[in-house]
């Protein structure tokens, strides 16, 4: 059966993974090459960039390493440091911070001695839960941006998203019997998504869900927010040149100190091209320093029902996967904002989506339309290779 998307005007889908498409990642480290099966993402670090003056390359060497066990994705760090020992020290710190933040923001698993987002969900309607300040800050951040952007991305939509998660898991494990969630179940769950019932007591560091049937799902923001925390801490610790790639999020620290490039090149993956991420199958390249890029797309987590691809980005207005675009990419300073906005813009019709992006200072965006056309804000065009950057 031919696979078609929810939008009748969309092209047929090429075979895709979970938004984390398999490829062989070859990481060059000083004196050795490590080959790993890793996960490709919508954004790809590229070798191409503007050429600058040489000089720093004599002082800095390139190192990289990856994490496979946090935030359900591959996290890769590429950095230029004076020595491998210094890189290893920075990476060890980043690894521990990502693991701690993963445990705090996890909605599926318990950890001994930790009250996390799952703990909050487990106590919905029962009592406030005392949590780490980093959970308080994440939820305040998400509520603030929810209100600033019209309420499309709602961390209180856990009841609805859990239904989709369960049906997607079942559909992926047993494709022949994959089903749509019943709309009556989704509408019943929708009654329990009022973000105002997420009661945050910042002074006492507690969170209480006033509706016993509601739950939090921070998947649209947690990974980017955690990436921003780690990037800022590493810059403060003296890391001058690095890129952190976490799923569909990329955060650059400084510029590449290789004596060749003045900016990092980030490729926007073509959803319908080869699963091997290289410069031959990207839609475009954007160039950044000290900035973040995030993408949300319909080719990430999904399953198929009767030939229809059902991805994981659910429109709160319809309770169904949004079908305005193939992907949306956002560039801004803060990785958490980029992560949040890439989802929000994906959930809005183009004119509203573009108007929102243009109303926010320091935010640029690109939209991959169902027919493959790429539209972009003027500021995004200024840093896109196809536009002469």
Model-identified regions with their sequence ranges:
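Mature catalytic core of soluble alpha/beta enzymes
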Residues: 3-9, 15-389
């Amino acid at each position: 059966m031919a696979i078609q998307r929810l939008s009748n005007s969309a092209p047929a889908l090429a075979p895709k993974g979970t938004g984390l498409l398999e490829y062989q990642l070859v990481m060059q480290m000083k004196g050795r090459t490590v080959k790993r099966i890793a996960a490709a993402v919508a954004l790809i670090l590229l070798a191409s960039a503007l050429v600058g003056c040489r000089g720093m390359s004599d002082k800095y060497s390139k190192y990289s390493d990856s994490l496979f066990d946090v935030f359900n994705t591959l996290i890769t760090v590429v950095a230029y440091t004076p020595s491998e020992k210094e890189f290893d020290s920075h990476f060890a710190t980043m690894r521990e911070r990502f693991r701690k933040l993963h445990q705090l923001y996890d909605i599926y698993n318990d950890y001994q001695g930790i009250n996390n987002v799952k703990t909050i969900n487990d106590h919905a309607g029962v009592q406030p839960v005392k949590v780490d300040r980093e959970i308080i800050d994440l939820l305040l951040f998400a509520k603030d941006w929810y209100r600033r952007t019209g309420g499309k991305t709602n961390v209180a939509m856990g009841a609805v998203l859990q239904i989709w998660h369960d049906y997607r898991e079942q559909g992926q494990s047993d494709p022949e019997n994959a089903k749509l969630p019943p709309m009556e179940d989704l509408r019943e769950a929708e009654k329990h998504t009022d973000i105002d019932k997420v009661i945050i007591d910042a002074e006492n560091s507690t969170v209480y869900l006033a509706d016993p049937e509601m739950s939090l799902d921070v998947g649209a923001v947690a990974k980017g927010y955690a990436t921003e925390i780690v990037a800022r801490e590493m810059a403060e610790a003296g890391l001058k040149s690095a890129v952190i790639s976490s799923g569909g999020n990329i955060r650059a620290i400084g510029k590449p100190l290789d004596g060749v490039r003045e900016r990092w090149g980030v490729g926007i993956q073509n959803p319908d091209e080869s699963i091997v991420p290289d410069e031959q199958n990207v839609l475009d390249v954007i160039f950044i320093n000290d900035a973040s890029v995030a993408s949300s797309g319909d080719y990430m987590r999904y399953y198929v029902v009767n030939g229809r691809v059902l991805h994981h980005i659910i429109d709160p207005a319809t309770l169904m996967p949004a079908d305005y675009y193939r992907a949306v990419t956002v560039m801004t300073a803060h990785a958490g904002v980029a992560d949040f906005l890439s989802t929000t813009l994906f959930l809005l019709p183009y004119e509203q989506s573009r108007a929102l992006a243009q109303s926010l200072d320091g935010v640029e965006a690109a939209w991959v339309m169902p027919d493959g056309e790429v539209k972009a804000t003027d500021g995004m065009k200024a840093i896109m290779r196809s536009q002469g950057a």
